[in-house]
Amino acid sequence: MIVALKGNIEKKEPTRLWLEVGGVTYEIFISIHTSAALGEKEARLLITHLIREEAWSLYGFAEEAEKRVFDTLIKINGVGPKAALAILSTYTPPTFAQIIQAQDVKALQRVPGIGPKSAGRIMVELAGFSLSLQEGSKASTPPVFEESRLALESLGFKSELIAKALQNIQATTTQEIIKEALKKLQTLR
């Protein structure tokens, strides 16, 4: 099984990449977030290799968290790799985890190709889903979104409102996330 590939980028589209590795060019399907994170010449991607009757496909990820969400989603009956990539192109892994924890079905339905039935099934199947990486992870502190969520809870905000406020925030530090979330929370009350 292929776990990762490193090579030269021959062609890059928003959701697809041609990667030349040792004289062989691979077509790898990627999310929009992974595409944005990649350079123009070289890339190293974590790979999920799916073997189906009709095709052998490679799906690439710039981060382990994105790969973990993808691998979890494709195990759900009725959610295929295209739907999983659509979710990951719409939401970052921390935002997706917040949506699942808040049971925000409407946010999930904003993903192209995800209707009420699929959104409900995903919510049921992923109840209790956590983005924390398995043992051996270098991260010893919780993700910045988890820190922000806890800080907002300590200020007395309800978890449902916090989850809505944290959606689509692109900030990368706890302080920036909390600032943006507080602005959103003022309009949500």
Swiss-Prot record:
Q: What's the name of the protein?
A: Holliday junction branch migration complex subunit RuvA
Q: Subunit structure of this entry?
A: Homotetramer. Forms an RuvA(8)-RuvB(12)-Holliday junction (HJ) complex. HJ DNA is sandwiched between 2 RuvA tetramers; dsDNA enters through RuvA and exits via RuvB. An RuvB hexamer assembles on each DNA strand where it exits the tetramer. Each RuvB hexamer is contacted by two RuvA subunits (via domain III) on 2 adjacent RuvB subunits; this complex drives branch migration. In the full resolvosome a probable DNA-RuvA(4)-RuvB(12)-RuvC(2) complex forms which resolves the HJ.
- Name its cellular compartments: Cytoplasm
Record keywords: Cytoplasm, DNA damage, DNA recombination, DNA repair, DNA-binding
Q: What does this protein do?
A: The RuvA-RuvB-RuvC complex processes Holliday junction (HJ) DNA during genetic recombination and DNA repair, while the RuvA-RuvB complex plays an important role in the rescue of blocked DNA replication forks via replication fork reversal (RFR). RuvA specifically binds to HJ cruciform DNA, conferring on it an open structure. The RuvB hexamer acts as an ATP-dependent pump, pulling dsDNA into and through the RuvAB complex. HJ branch migration allows RuvC to scan DNA until it finds its consensus sequence, where it cleaves and resolves the cruciform DNA.
| Spans annotated as Domain III | 140-189
- The region called Domain II is annotated at 63-138
The cellular component terms of Gene Ontology attached to this UniProt record, alphabetical and capped at eight, are: cytoplasm; Holliday junction helicase complex; Holliday junction resolvase complex
Q: Which GO terms describe its molecular function?
A: ATP binding; four-way junction DNA binding; four-way junction helicase activity
Say which family it is in. Answer: Belongs to the RuvA family.
Segment Domain I: which positions?
A: 1-62
